[in-house]
């Protein structure tokens, strides 16, 4: 399933770039796959970019498990072929309407975005260290690169 963003046609995003003249389509944010990627790569931090594209959505749906008629799983199987016949189990999180264009500190971000990022951290067991709305607008919560 996808979210549609037809009412933003002709507008500019937080980076100042024109939005597509077509409908923008958003898939479900798959936290099961992200948790797996963090685990197999021994990630100690996550960077989430283009959060400006989610501003204005009433809800943001995230995948927290996969299910079929035989039950549900919360991990990525060894072979993706094993997911045949499964469907995403989703949870709806509150969206936010505020633009992220002027935010320079984590504390300035909308409360619903704080909740979203906290949920991502809880499910993946990995902190979100970098938050970005555009190349010029990023918030680094903990400096993870040195040198």
Residue ranges and their predicted role:
Residues 1-147:
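Non-transmembrane, aqueous-exposed alpha-helical and coiled segments at domain scale
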């Amino acid at each position: 399933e996808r979210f549609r963003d037809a009412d933003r046609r002709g507008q500019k995003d937080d980076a100042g770039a024109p939005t597509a003249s077509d409908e923008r389509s958003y898939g479900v944010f798959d936290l099961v796959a992200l948790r797996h990627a963090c685990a197999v790569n021994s990630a100690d931090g996550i960077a989430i970019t283009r959060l400006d594209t989610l501003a204005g959505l009433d809800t943001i749906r995230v995948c927290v498990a996969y299910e079929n008629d035989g039950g549900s799983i919360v991990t990525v199987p060894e072979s993706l072929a094993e997911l045949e016949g499964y469907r995403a189990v989703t949870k709806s999180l509150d969206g936010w309407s505020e633009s992220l264009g002027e935010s320079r500190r984590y504390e300035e971000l909308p409360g619903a975005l704080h909740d979203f990022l906290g949920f991502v951290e809880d499910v993946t067991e990995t902190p979100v260290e970098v938050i970005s709305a555009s190349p010029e607008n990023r918030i680094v919560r903990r400096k993870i690169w040195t040198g």
